[in-house]
Design a protein with these regions (language model features):
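Intrinsically disordered, low-complexity polar/charged tails and linkers
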Residues: 1-165, 169-173, 177-207
């Protein structure tokens, strides 16, 4: 059973990947898209020679051309999913699109995008200057949010990718994680440290 985050965190998108054991030619898929695009509302792009991007049935697929120099299965990404059942349904829809029969295909979750809220106004400039944390990056000329990186004591594997953008409203955008337990632990750490810093800043903010 997949772990579910607390009500503080909402999964807004899942990027997953799967492999086709029966490869399909990109030109064939393009022809299928042309045949079905008006009827099924398919939108597709082939701007790079080895990548075909397709929007279909509420999902986005990125199909990679199989190399002629390898026997490995053909790789495909799927996004715009909110839960695991979305991924399963999306894969079956893709099999229909490429004219292959339904089958169970394993998938890997590569990345979650989540939203969260600390529930209060956060003076991010003061939090940054007060905390002096090595995990905080504040560049207001680039983005109006405090960037918070995941510390290695929460996830050694995701310390370079899992991050949170914290806005003054208290809203958070969390990306780069592939494990909901780690994302929950990361957000809990952010919440406790930022709120604690805000409490020490209360006299300054009120003066």
């Amino acid at each position: 059973m997949m772990f579910e985050c607390s009500r503080d965190i909402e999964v807004t998108n899942i990027k997953a990947s799967f492999k086709l054991d029966t490869p399909v030619d990109l030109e064939y898929v393009k022809n299928r898209c042309r045949q079905l695009e008006s009827k099924l509302g398919i939108v597709w792009y082939h701007t790079k020679p080895n990548i075909l991007t397709i929007r279909f049935s509420g999902h986005t697929y990125i199909l990679f051309k199989r190399s002629s120099h390898t026997e490995q299965a053909q790789h495909c990404n799927i996004t715009r999913c909110r839960c695991c059942s979305d991924i399963v349904i999306g894969i079956q829809n893709f099999l229909f699109l490429i004219d292959q029969p339904p089958k169970i295909i394993d998938y890997t979750i590569d990345n979650y995008s989540c939203s969260a809220n600390l529930g209060q106004f956060i003076p991010i400039d003061l939090v940054y200057s007060k905390s002096r944390s090595q995990y905080h990056i504040y560049q207001p000329e680039r983005i109006s949010a405090l960037e918070i990186r995941c510390p290695p004591f929460i996830s050694e594997d995701r310390k370079d990718s899992l991050c949170c953008l914290l806005y003054r409203s208290g809203k958070c955008s969390i990306v780069g994680g592939n494990n909901l337990l780690e994302i929950q632990a990361f957000f809990d750490w952010i919440k406790s440290t930022v709120i604690e810093t805000c409490q020490t800043l209360a006299p300054i903010c009120q003066s």
